From Swiss-Prot:
[4Fe-4S] cluster 1 binds at residues 12, 49, 83. SUPFAM superfamilies: Radical SAM enzymes. HAMAP family: tRNA_metthiotr_MiaB. Monomer. Residues 381-444 form the TRAM domain. The keyword Phosphoprotein does not apply. Residues 3-120 form the MTTase N-terminal domain. GO terms for molecular function: 4 iron, 4 sulfur cluster binding; metal ion binding; N6-isopentenyladenosine methylthiotransferase activity. It comes from Nitrosospira multiformis (strain ATCC 25196 / NCIMB 11849 / C 71). The lineage of its organism: Bacteria, Pseudomonadati, Pseudomonadota, Betaproteobacteria, Nitrosomonadales. This is tRNA-2-methylthio-N(6)-dimethylallyladenosine synthase. Binds 2 [4Fe-4S] clusters. One cluster is coordinated with 3 cysteines and an exchangeable S-adenosyl-L-methionine. Keywords: 4Fe-4S, Cytoplasm, Iron, Iron-sulfur, Metal-binding, S-adenosyl-L-methionine, Transferase, tRNA processing.
């Protein structure tokens, strides 16, 4: 009987990707099958995230909830991976002696060896090292179900924003070789994948080695997109998360040259105040950010922009917050992830004095979220009556009698249709805009790409000013 593996994942899409790779590694090496029931598992893994406040305590809380399973089954192995594991290391075993494995994001490929060593020696195994790119060299071939897939193209971050733990938990930026990425994605098309999302902490900072290139010559992110665009079978290209400092003119030009590159960019700004941006060590100003957006919309008039915001960074005044609100008004965002600042141990910002009352931070966050939500809903409403090219991904979560897919600008559309449409592109007429999704009806379903110029005008039926306030981006 195959052994059972239970994985609980916290945090970002990088962690989701890593968890899938953990399952792949253990399936190949030890024939483990995933289970959704921790009580039935032979191995329980927690893939953790340390971005939010009290992340460590949440991990120990979850560990405590499975401790009784270890008491009932001494052969059960419990492991902690991800960013909290990188931060805490052997301290996890000290606080929770029933933990058998502690591993970082860069050492998940060593799980089979760690498990074997634990079973032979009886001693907990801790490996939170940062081997350069070794992880990707030892991962099994990509497997996926469905027509979409995530592919990690780089790891780590070298920006060292004052509030962020990523450089300390995932290491500095390391890029996979260009040919390795292209080979993996070409293999995914053989599994039926039509849309790929490229992953990295700062994905547009990619600088990968090229086979047969001159020594020291590296492929940048724009060149990777150019090569990826030529892979037969890949119809859509997404990526996350990008950094404004790495948004080069070549990357912006790709939105003119590459129709497969979707009309959606997630570009975290964090604040609209230059003073706060400097304190965050973000490396750009509000005006520079708006300049990127203006040039993006010139290259791709229908592009959808989403972002990240931190409210209540130490020292943020009402004037600083109002600068953020003015930026939101100017850009016209299509959604955001926004949070109240939480101090992360070991980061430069952790030592900054914070005198802003928590209630004030809550009120600011609510105002910001309401503003962005209104903008996003207005964009959704303007899509009603247009025809959208949707990749049908599967059954609707809300109604299994319907289908669900995503538009080019990342809107979820639910619509009536037959299961035979799953995995294909469909032209849908948008009939209603709900709070977080769209409703549609089928016009035509096939695999033929729609000309991007035609898609732009079908999508919105108007010029760029109907999508974003370009005149305000100065």
């Amino acid at each position: 009987m195959a052994k059972k593996l239970y994985i609980k994942t916290f945090g970002c899409q990088m962690n989701e990707y890593d968890s899938k790779k953990m399952a792949d590694v253990l399936r190949d090496a030890q024939h483990m099958e995933k289970t959704d029931d921790p009580a039935a598992a032979d191995v329980i893994l927690f893939n953790t995230c340390s971005v939010r406040e009290k992340a460590q305590e949440k991990v120990f809380h979850d560990l405590g909830r499975v401790r009784h399973l270890k008491a009932a089954n001494p052969d059960l192995l419990i492991g902690v991976g991800g960013c909290v594991a990188s931060q805490e290391g052997a301290e996890i075993v000290k606080r929770a002696p029933y933990v058998d494995l502690v591993f970082g994001p860069q050492t998940l490929h060593r799980l089979p060896q760690m498990i074997s060593t634990r079973q032979i020696t009886g001693r907990p195994q801790v490996d939170i090292s940062f081997p350069e790119i070794e992880k990707f060299d030892h991962l099994p071939p990509a497997r996926t179900e469905g027509v979409t897939a995530f592919v990690s193209i780089m790891e780590g971050c070298s920006k060292y924003c004052s509030f962020c733990v990523v450089p300390y938990t995932r290491g500095e930026e390391i890029s996979r070789p260009l040919d390795d990425i292209l080979t993996e994605i070409a293999g995914l098309t053989n599994l039926g994948v039509k849309e790929v999302t490229l992953l990295g902490q700062n994905v547009n900072a990619y600088r990968g080695r090229m086979q047969y290139a001159e020594e020291g010559e590296l492929a940048d992110f724009a060149l990777l997109l150019e090569y990826l665009h030529e892979i037969p079978g890949i119809e859509r290209i997404r990526y996350t998360t990008s950094h404004p400092r790495e948004f080069t003119p070549r990357l912006i030009e790709a939105y003119k040259a590459s129709p497969k590159l979707v009309s959606h960019v997630h570009l975290p700004v964090q604040s609209g105040s230059d003073r706060i941006l400097a304190a965050m060590k973000r490396g750009y100003t509000s005006l520079e950010y708006k300049s990127i957006i203006r040039r993006l919309r010139a290259a791709r008039p229908d592009i959808s922009i989403t972002s990240d915001f931190i409210v209540g960074f130490p020292g943020e005044t009402e004037a600083d917050f109002e600068a953020t609100m003015k930026l939101i008004e100017a850009v016209n965002f299509d959604g955001s992830f926004s949070f109240i600042y939480s101090s992360r141990p070991g980061t430069p910002a952790a030592g900054l004095e914070d005198t802003t009352p928590h209630q004030v931070k809550l009120e600011r966050l609510q105002r910001l979220q309401e503003k962005v939500e209104l903008q996003a809903q207005a964009i959704s409403v303007r899509m009603v009556g247009t025809t959208q090219r949707v990749l049908v991904e599967g059954l609707s979560r809300k109604d299994p009698g319907e289908l669900s897919g995503r538009t080019d600008n990342n809107r979820v559309v639910n619509f009536p249709g037959s299961p035979e449409m799953i995995g294909k592109f469909a032209e849908l007429k948008i009939t209603a805009a709900l709070s977080h999704t769209l409703r549609g009806e089928n016009v035509r379903a096939d695999d033929a790409p729609i000309e991007p110029e035609a898609a732009i005008f079908r999508r919105y039926g108007a010029g760029p000013d109907s999508i974003g306030n370009r005149d305000n981006l100065t």
